[in-house]
Amino acid sequence: MKKSVILNLAGLLIVSFLSCNRENTNVLYRFDNIPDRIWAGEDFWTIPLEDWHIKNGRIECLSDIQQATFSVLPYILKDDDASFRISFDMGLLSKGAHDGSSGVIIGSEALEEKDVRAAVYFGKGIRMGVNTKGYAFLEQQIRQLPAGFDFSHFKIEATGSKISDGYTVGMKVFDVTGKVLAELSLKPENAVTGIIQLVNNLRNASSGNKGPKFWYDNLHIDGPKFTKIEDNSFGPVLWTMHTLSRNILKLTAQFPPVSKSENQNAQFQVKQDGKWQTLATGKMDKDARCITWKLENWDSTVDHEYRVLFDFINSMGNKQIAEYAGIIRRDPVDRPLRLGALTCQFGSGFPYSPVEKNLELLNPDMLYFSGDQIYEQNGGYPIRRTPEDTAIVNYLGKYYMFGWAFGDLMRSLPTICTPDDHDVYHGNLWGEGGINKITPGNLGGFTQTVGFVNVVNRTQCAHLPDPFDPTPIGQGMSVWYTDLNYGKISFAIVTDRIFKTSPDKVASWEGRKDWLKTPLKDPSSIEVPGLELLGKRQEDFLREWIRDWKGVEMKVLLSQTLFTNVATHHGQFDAYLYGDLDSDGWPKSGRDRAIEIMRKGFVFHIAGDQHVPSIVQYGIDNYRDAGWCYVTPAISVGYSRWFRPDELGIPVKNRPAHGLPNTGEYKDAFGNLNYVYAIGNPGNYKVVSNRYQLAQDKSSGFGMVIFDKEQRNITMESYRFLADVSGKEPGNQHPGWPFTINQFDNYGREAAAWLPTLKFNGEADPVVEIINQTTDELECSVRINGNEFNPKVFSKDIFTIRAGYPEKDVWKVIENIKPLNKQNQEELIITF
């Protein structure tokens, strides 16, 4: 993680905290000078976020769940035989419905790596504390507490020291007078290393939810075994995301839930001529806890150092200024653009370090997170749907995991981020234009309040370019569909959930209305008038977008999932499913309209969501008559899917030359024609204790897409979760990758006729549009590569050619062009 910098308010003296080993750590955390707030401070991380508060000058846990943790981030027990001591006051707030415990975990580490983020959520260490049944415990050892023990206020002390035959860890329980009431010790089998975690209601075989709730204070950390790693601290500027498009910078800084009585304002500064200049200030959104800045007339030809400054009260109760710094890189218009494409962050793989490290080595120019930045299970605690303010903080606690994992990459890389169904607490989502989901049996609409959904949109999308049409939809719900130009690539960013029609509008079968377990007798029964996928607003946007080539050479659609149904097995290896109406293979009418628009602009499609990587060429009337889609691997797979038609005896035609199984031309359950070039199926994996190995076995990973603007080539790469990209290991990528197509492969439709070969006397790479004069419909719109173009058409009608340079607004229109039977029969010279 990057170094963080703190400026002392009194003298504005800059002090840089680096990883260091002190002779003796001696730190006392008291909370008297910190205002009442949810966020405990930059030195701590609490789970669940909404259940820990600083109140009454102490830490209070209000959680009903087991294993609610308060982790200390910067002070780590290192691997040596030095001594340590930890002590803290604590007391009972409420007994709860069941007996339970509280105490501390010493030396908490995750199995997979020594990363503080992993330790916070998956660490295991030495457990000690007290139980409201009246005993103290140290692992499996128990000492009865005196009869009438006062749980309202007592003290726990944990120690470690070298002894003649190894190392010993001890625990004492004191009453308020300092009298020792219980004492235990043990010789640990393994080295005592890692973080310390205060825990409310420790999980064990006999524990349950709705246990007691405790408060904590005067946390004292002492001894030479501790080392301070300042980089482990997190906040108060948690991370930033930004985009740069058409010389407009938009940047969002994310903050934790500080007190309403504290400062809510931050500064955005850029270094100019060696000096920091404040370009903008902003006030934190009261619900989303973020600030978004929009700066126009940005010089995108050079790199800019930036920083966000924020006054806050730190973990020690002192006023300080936090600085979060990064770089706004120049627009890479003069070289290939490298896009890191990611999706689906199931918490079992957190903090996804192999993915993060490999991305850093591959050095992308920008990032795309296509959805499911959170899952409801992430963090190991349940979602809270009500009341709205609690639900929002519950969401933020899970969403902050995303920023903690990838923030160091995002601080200096333009990042496109779009929410999907799980981000708004839906397993599947058919938004129907933002309506409220009134009953559990109604699949359409949103379960959460519009205020909650707008917070999700604001935290994840506020830094995107302004929406094409910002008019709110149902209930006043915000929208974020837009376009972004970067590196001479134009990206359309759309939602394929929010406007989508619900299956219960057409489903007549028993059971789940979104699952087809067997073929329908009449497939047309689920295709009725009025069904929507992207919705009219986004279709109109795309029709306009494919004709806007100003400053760009290639076009890409970014959405959450692909426009077809590829998976054959869901959840379990042998769990066959004929058709899934959560896929965007349905509704077919809406799917076909979207693909028809896309192919006219030679648009390449990148999506996620499916948990199995694939490369698919779409077909509408015939196989392969439209564009290509790359579905990227999930960062960390929870719910597995497979595409295994060969095992089911499903007929295949035209298998690719590589001969890999489960590839070729297939028709899906809804009649969509799909050419599957590559599929990254998981095997019949077994659950293993190593979370990263399990992610690897479940086909997790990430994608890279390289856009070569000179050749107009698009190269797709699909890296496994545990890949080593520093070398060229043959198993780094899923089978079938890497794969390269050309921009002009994204209109695969066979020609019915040809227009004359267009030859341009003028600058290279003009934009060409072909318009059918009979129907007045656009046939295609594209920036050609060079000075020559062979337009194909799909009827013998008469056509208009419109060609020119949108940057100069210089155009020529040539009408009444008759098509030819063969390519290159005639030439048409157009001079500018």
Q: What does each model-found stretch correspond to?
A:
Residues N24-P48:
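Extracellular carbohydrate-recognition regions
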Residues E50-A68:
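Short carbohydrate-recognition loop motifs
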Residues S63-L138:
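Secretory/extracellular carbohydrate-interaction modules
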Residues F88, A147-L186, I714:
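Carbohydrate-binding surfaces in secreted/extracellular proteins
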Residues I105-K162, F670-L694:
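Glycine-aromatic-enriched beta-strand/loop faces of beta-sandwich-type recognition domains
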Residues F174-G194, P730-N742:
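Short, solvent-exposed beta-strand-to-loop segments that form ligand-recognition rims
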Residues L181-F214:
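Flexible glycan-contacting loops in extracellular carbohydrate-active proteins
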Residues G208, P212-W215, H220-P224, L244-R246, ...:
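Long, structured stretches of catalytic cores involved in phosphate-ester chemistry, encompassing
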